[in-house]
Amino acid sequence: MSAYPKSYNPFDDDGEDEGARPAPWRDARDLPDGPDAPADRQQYLRQEVLRRAEATAASTSRSLALMYESEKVGVASSEELARQRGVLERTEKMVDKMDQDLKISQKHINSIKSVFGGLVNYFKSKPVETPPEQNGTLASQPNSRLKEAISSSKEQEAKYQASHPNLRRLDDTDPVPRGAGSAVSTDAYPKNPHLQAYHQKIDSNLDELSVGLGRLKDIALGMQTEIEEQDDILDRLTTKVDKLDVNIKSTERKVRQL
């Protein structure tokens, strides 16, 4: 069962301290009776609806700021994964080059086992050495899915700067004027411009949240693909290093036998 009685409004939790209990929900029945009671109830309901709309708009704006912040963290993590991929690929190329050099050394060792035949073969058919590849000549690229996700999210960086709670205040850029609760005494609910503005703000924030969550999903899926591909590189690298270690030990034994 709920921890709060039925008279409490759960939406009050958003704007208050975590340790505080939510304010009780009030409606027209809580107002005193009297000659002006119907007008007071109507006035109160208008103000209450407007206050709730304002709180909801503020809540969605905070959620939007957190979404952009999460997206920025996701982009930074994705870029770090891309750099890690470059390190792994360069390491794999270095191991391949070491293996190639070791094979050439083994051929030389086998050739000089016979003094005459080894010298003849060595000068007659010297193995063609492949020039070593320069590290960093080609920039490593992440998988296409992650690359597209990073590019799409970086286009939203300006929105992140505009919505970050440490860089702006909600009332600095909101089109809804502050203190609107006192301006509804003569406005009918369907025609209240302040309420309409809050609704537009809420709808806009929810639309941006929906699109932003889609981008976050793309980043997550791209990172998953990138991690899986890097796992494959690590598996190949581990196998090559183990094989290289065996060949090095074998070459050492052959050198000692000369």
Swiss-Prot record:
Molecular-function GO terms, alphabetical: SNAP receptor activity; syntaxin binding
Family annotation (CDD domains): SNARE_SNAP29C, SNARE_SNAP29N
Modified residues (Phosphothreonine): T130, T137
Principal location class: cytoplasm
GO cellular component: autophagosome; autophagosome membrane; centrosome; ciliary pocket membrane; cytoplasmic vesicle; cytosol; Golgi membrane; presynapse
Localization per record: Cytoplasm; Golgi apparatus membrane; Cytoplasmic vesicle, Autophagosome membrane; Cell projection, Cilium membrane
Keyword Oxidoreductase: no
Coiled-coil parts of chain: 76-107
Topological category with respect to the lipid bilayer: Peripheral membrane protein
Any GO BP: synaptic vesicle fusion to presynaptic active zone membrane
Residues found modified as Phosphoserine: S77, S78, S114, S163, S182, S185, S204, S210
Bias (Basic and acidic residues): 18-32
Region called Disordered, residue ranges: 1-41, 127-190
Keyword Mitochondrion included in the entry's annotation: no
InterPro entries: T_SNARE_dom
UniProtKB keywords: Autophagy, Cell membrane, Cell projection, Cilium, Cilium biogenesis/degradation, Coiled coil, Cytoplasm, Cytoplasmic vesicle, Golgi apparatus, Membrane, Phosphoprotein, Protein transport, Transport
Segments forming domain t-SNARE coiled-coil homology: 196-258
Compositionally biased spans, kind Polar residues: 132-144
SUPFAM superfamilies cross-referenced by the UniProt entry: SNARE fusion complex (SSF58038)
Xref: PANTHER family: SYNAPTOSOMAL ASSOCIATED PROTEIN (PTHR19305), SYNAPTOSOMAL-ASSOCIATED PROTEIN 29 (PTHR19305:SF9)
Purpose: SNAREs, soluble N-ethylmaleimide-sensitive factor-attachment protein receptors, are essential proteins for fusion of cellular membranes. SNAREs localized on opposing membranes assemble to form a trans-SNARE complex, an extended, parallel four alpha-helical bundle that drives membrane fusion. SNAP29 is a SNARE involved in autophagy through the direct control of autophagosome membrane fusion with the lysososome membrane. Also plays a role in ciliogenesis by regulating membrane fusions.
Quaternary state and interactors: Forms a SNARE complex, composed of VAMP8, SNAP29 and STX17, involved in fusion of autophagosome with lysosome. Interacts with multiple syntaxins including STX6. Interacts with EIPR1. Interacts with STX17; this interaction is increased in the absence of TMEM39A.
Name of protein: Synaptosomal-associated protein 29
Naturally occurring in which organism (per UniProt): Pongo abelii
